[in-house]
Amino acid sequence: MPGILVRPDQSFEEAYRLFKKQVDRNLIVTEARARRFYEKPTERRKKEKIAARKKMLKRLYMLRRYESRL
């Protein structure tokens, strides 16, 4: 769980910026949005499969693009 200790010489804006950075690193907002509604295990697997396919196609595209430059 993110948390920061505010020093006496630290402004609120700086402390808030550090807190936001920690929240982003820990993916708290993303996880909260994902858990907002129940997702069936089959739907989750389907999304993971689609994401894996997109990732593979992107890598393949980048590899072919790189090889064409050689």
From Swiss-Prot:
InterPro entries: Ribosomal_bS21, Ribosomal_bS21_sf
Signal peptide per UniProt: none
Keyword terms of this UniProt record: Ribonucleoprotein, Ribosomal protein
Record GO cellular component, one term: ribonucleoprotein complex
Molecular function terms from GO: structural constituent of ribosome
Keyword Ribosomal protein: yes
GO biological process, any: translation
Domain of life: Bacteria
HAMAP family (alphabetical): Ribosomal_bS21
Protein family (similarity comment): Belongs to the bacterial ribosomal protein bS21 family.
Protein name, per record: Small ribosomal subunit protein bS21
Gene name in the database record: rpsU
